[in-house]
Amino acid sequence: MLKWDEEYLRLCKKILNEGKEVENRTINNTIKIPSYNFNLDVSKEFPILTVKKLFSRQAFLELLWIYQVGSNDVNWLQDRRVSIWDEWKIDLDGYWNAKQKVLNPDGSHEIKEIHKYFGKEYAGTIGEAYGYIVNKYKGVDRVLDIIKNHPKARDNVMSLWYNCHLDKGVLRPCVWSHEVDITNGTLNMYVHQRSCDVPLGLPFNVTQFAALMHLYARVGGYKVGTLSWSIKDAHIYVNQVEKIKELIERGKTLSIYEGYKNRTWLEGQLQNYKEEYDKILKTLTKEELINLKKGIVPDVLKSTDLKVKVCDYVLNPPSPELWVNPDVKDFYKFNNDDECKDIKVLNYKDLGKINFPVSE
């Protein structure tokens, strides 16, 4: 199991064991802990979850959308088959519509339809947030200038938090700032996250900023070092708890099999599980087979599917690394088309997809 997998599962367990259930602006309560911090050595391991599938292409395109393109236009993402921001897209009439908890005068909460007007000029966007802020204040330009010309500077900070724009964006930035440090030819990064959807947001965010470290390092000709992460309000939504428990059980199963040292025995188990898998496969309905191609494993196959993946994982462990096109040294020239062909994760293997619900 990768170091990032271990850290992630440790956080999930901590939230379930020590967290408090609280209300928030969404329909679903969260179980939260007030803060959490961790460090990852990006020089030794590219942090991408393997206990569940992470779609790196989408993650990298969202990263480029914000920090390279400086865009708030959801259509840009949709044109590249990225649907992350669909639910926060402002309609053509200038309104953003959602269901949220509203505080009544008597102190009670009520779920109501929200119709917030931003203006028709913001149609198709998320308002004045994320890439809009990057573009308006040229924050990345400053980061790159310091990396190239003033590497010893201690003020290389990129912030998305501007009070005058907070009410003009559909969402306030969750990961709201990052700092760059260069010491002895190594580029390190410190990331601040004010609110963290651990099941959905954090896996994407960590992989994105580890990639951003590599892109920044390429510009300045540096090595990558430590990614330090600070979370205020690390939470799991109550409707995500069962899936998180499933993920934790995956981790336990993987740890058990990693403890088996007899390779011949593991190879035999893998063969047995594959035969069992094929037998169950023949009993599936047409609809179940279609879903399986989409990564949705039917309940009758889940246990065997996991055992096949776990045995293969232990016998041929993943060692993910980030490939960045060596011919590109200008941050603004990394390809951001549909294929995101200048940034790829190599040697990646996962234990399968888990779908978590989103809370607006």
Where are these predicted regions, by residue range?
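Terminal, non-catalytic protein-protein interaction segments that mediate quaternary/complex assembly
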Residues: M1-E360
